[in-house]
Amino acid sequence: VFVSAHPDIILKMGTKDVLYRTRHMEWGGDTRLYASPAQLRRELPVSLAPGKVRVLKQYRGNGGDGVWKVEPVGTDGPARAASLLRVRHAKRGSREETMTLEAFCARCAPYFAGQGRMIDQAYQERLPEGMVRCYLVHDTIAGFGHQAINALFPAPPGAPPGKAPQPGPRLYHPPTESAFQALKRKVEQEWVPEMQQLLDIPKARLPVLWDCDFLLGPRRPSGEDTYVLCEINVSSVAPYPETAPPYIAAATLARLQEAVRRRRPASARK
C-alpha cells in the first residue's frame, strides 16, 4: 500500500520536535524543549530573560493552535510566577493578553497530555518581512509560497496591540522564482541532506509532498540573509503551487514502480 509518508517519518519530521532535534543546524538557533508542565514553570523564566521575546509551540498542531508569542512586561529582573507577561495566540482571531507567568503555564498544561511537550524558540524580529514556504517532493523543491502578513504579525508602530493585522493570503511561485534561489540552494544542497542524516531518513522515505516554513533571521555582516526554520508540514500539505503536480506524479510513479519491482520473484527482476 502506497502512502505519501510513513507514520514513523511523520513523527520524525512532521512534529515540532524537529525544531529541537535540528537546532544545531544552520536553520536552527536558541531552541528549547519542555517535556512537562513542571519543566515549563522551572525553565521558562530563564528563557524569558529581561528583554527576551519567545515563541512557544505545542508538539503537534496546525493553524497556529498552540503557538504563543510570549514576552515579559518590564525588564526588572528574572520572571517569577507572579510576573506579568504579554502573550498572543497565533490562532486566527486571537488578540494580545496580559497574564501572570503562572496563569500562562496553567493555560499550556493541556499541551502536555499523553506524549505532549512544548518547543520554545527565539522570536524573529524580521517576521514582518514575511514567511517563505518551500514545497518539496522528496528532496527537490517544486515551488514556493510567500505570505507577507502571517500569524503573530505585530501592530503598526504606535498602534495598540489589538490593531495587529490578521494573516493574509499566501502567494505561490514556481521553483525558478529568482527571489528564492539562494534559499533553494541551501535547502536542496545542504539542509535537507543534513536533516536526513540527522534523523536517519533515506531519500526513498522522504514524503512525496511536504513543506518547510522559513522566517528571515539576522543578516550576516556581508548583508546576506539568514533563514530560521519555523515549521515542517508533512500531513495534508494543500493547497500547493501549480508547478508541483508534475513532480508529485513523477515521484509517485517511481514509488509504485519500485513497489511492483520488489514484489516480483527475484528471478523475474531485471
Regions found by a protein language model. Give the residues of each.
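Short, glycine/charged-enriched secondary-structure capping and boundary segments
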Residues: 17-19, 69-71, 247
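Conserved strand-to-helix beginnings and helix N-cap segments that scaffold or border functional pockets
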Residues: 15-16, 131, 242-246
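Conserved N-proximal alpha/beta basic substrate-recognition cap immediately N-terminal to
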Residues: 1-47, 62
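Phosphate-binding site of ATP-dependent enzymes
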Residues: 49-53, 60-65, 69-202, 216-218, ...
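A structural signal for short, well-ordered beta-strand segments and their strand-loop junctions
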Residues: 2-5, 32-33, 54-57, 69, ...
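C-terminal active-site "lid" helix and adjoining low-complexity regulatory extension at the edge
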Residues: 178, 182, 186, 200-211, ...
